């Protein structure tokens, strides 16, 4: 797994974290899922590829980010969260494929169980391997997007399929699959409990360093109360580099604030120096007037 996967995926695997996210994303803040009623399912799915028949393996392993089975309202549901740091322009096809394989796995399991018990009665049941009226568990997939840029990709199969106006009759025959996207920019943080409210509010600042500094300064108490895992996940979502020497339990968002301020100060200094260089001041003169190390200014000149 990549660095982001090594931090964010394990964060979602925590049952309380996952329940808080799904309760906000799917149930609009109602506390429906409870940690004691969910269990982890395998992330790997085996997909048959019938078109690969030239001697290569006709199986492909799909790995989903977080897969949980939840029991509520006398039923089981499979909830899945996929994490995205970048826009994916084929997301509807990708998610439709993943969910289809998930349903296929359920069906194969039912078919094996029915074959083992030997209680299929009609020829239609024997053919399908399922009892008449047999139901599968719902599969609910949510995409959590934390990228810097607003999502500008398709969120439905309809958006991906070429359908001219004079062929509108075909629309009802095409899959109506939709991607359920959670993006901090258009999500109400108040629907989320636990650390998620603060995480989503912080992510709303996007890549605007000034907005992020203002938010962190005005929400210092809430950020300090984030768990160590939540702080590390949030910093990773923000694209902050968690260096090895800082990769400790006590590293928090508020400790990262000082780095943000230093970076903002440095960026302002570089902006001023480049402006003076453009006005044909020499590095030596700039060093004198700004009381800065000339070697630092020389490095900026080299990078121009």
What is the role of each PLM region?
Residues 1-304:
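Elongated, amphipathic alpha-helical interaction scaffolds
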């Amino acid at each position: 797994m990549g660095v982001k996967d090594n931090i964010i995926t394990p964060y979602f695997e925590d049952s309380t974290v996952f329940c808080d996210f799904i309760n906000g994303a799917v149930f609009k803040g109602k506390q429906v899922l409870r940690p004691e009623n969910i269990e982890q399912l395998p992330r790997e799915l085996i997909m048959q590829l019938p078109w690969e028949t030239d001697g290569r393996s006709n199986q492909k392993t799909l790995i989903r980010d977080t897969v949980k089975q939840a029991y509520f309202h006398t039923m089981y549901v499979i909830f899945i969260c996929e994490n995205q740091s970048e826009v994916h322009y084929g997301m509807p096809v990708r998610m439709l494929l993943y969910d289809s394989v998930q349903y296929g796995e359920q069906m194969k399991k039912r078919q094996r169980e029915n074959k083992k018990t030997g209680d299929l009665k009609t020829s239609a049941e024997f053919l399908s391997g399922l009892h008449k009226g047999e139901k599968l568990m719902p599969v609910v997939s949510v995409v959590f997007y934390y990228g810097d840029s607003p999502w500008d990709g398709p969120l439905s199969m309809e958006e991906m399929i070429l359908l001219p106006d004079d062929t509108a009759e075909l629309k009802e025959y095409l899959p109506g699959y939709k991607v359920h996207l959670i993006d901090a920019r258009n999500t109400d943080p108040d629907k989320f409990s636990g650390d998620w409210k603060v995480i989503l509010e912080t992510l709303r600042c996007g890549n605007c360093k000034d907005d992020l500094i203002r938010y962190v300064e005005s929400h210092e108490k809430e950020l300090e109360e984030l768990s160590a895992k939540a702080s590390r996940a949030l910093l990773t979502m923000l694209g902050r580099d968690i260096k090895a020497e800082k990769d400790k339990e006590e590293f928090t968002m508020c400790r990262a604030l000082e780095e943000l301020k230093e970076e903002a100060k440095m960026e302002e200094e570089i902006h001023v120096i480049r402006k003076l260089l453009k006005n044909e001041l020499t590095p030596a003169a700039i060093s004198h007037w700004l009381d800065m190390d000339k070697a630092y200014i020389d490095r900026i000149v080299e990078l121009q």
